[in-house]
């Protein structure tokens, strides 16, 4: 089934730039889990780690930057400032370099070292924040920096910016619909800013009101899954819409890391721990289904950002 993929970005993007290659990622069949599923149940993963900046956050970062330019809030000479667990910051850095904007990010001190090195390689100014407060603490610091000089900074505020989820409403969801020929029955992904979940589910529910949507989160507040929120104990993003959730699937850090390793060694996919959490949750859900189903999840980022931590 063909569905036109909305491309609101095209008018603002020069062909041949790095931004022009964000999105249109492949949808991969995860066959190594087939023998544990009922006949007709399939698991697919959207390979967002293959975006130019290496993560699903490329889409939202581009959308927020373009919206900033369109609205006049982002002007030449301004610096982009935001809180991040790492991936959105890397996406800001890549796109900022391409479009001529300096970038400053606030991220927890315990963010993975490879992510920090990538940010530094782009010339990003890093402000490390209290690791015990996770990204909630980073948001507080980012707001303080922005408030100190609002004429200098563009603050996308990814946790509360509708351009975040609209990126997935306009691009990711139509891609999934077309790549599954409209057969998707279940969508499973983790919650960080919640932009991917909210945008994809809102659009796909317009196309298939019976779509079941599962939100993945760590099973405890103290976890090792960078980028994912334990919603019961974290600051809930302003863009999050609980009404879209069919059910919540909780994943232990250990299970996510084991699945991350299996993805590399049995499927040839070197991805990060949040991807492992998504696939583990999708597998547990799929294994419970007795009727034919198409379960789609997301590979959020590449495993290169976790070498020496997840992979030893």
Per-region residue spans from a language model:
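PLP-dependent amino-acid enzyme catalytic core
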Residues: 1-312
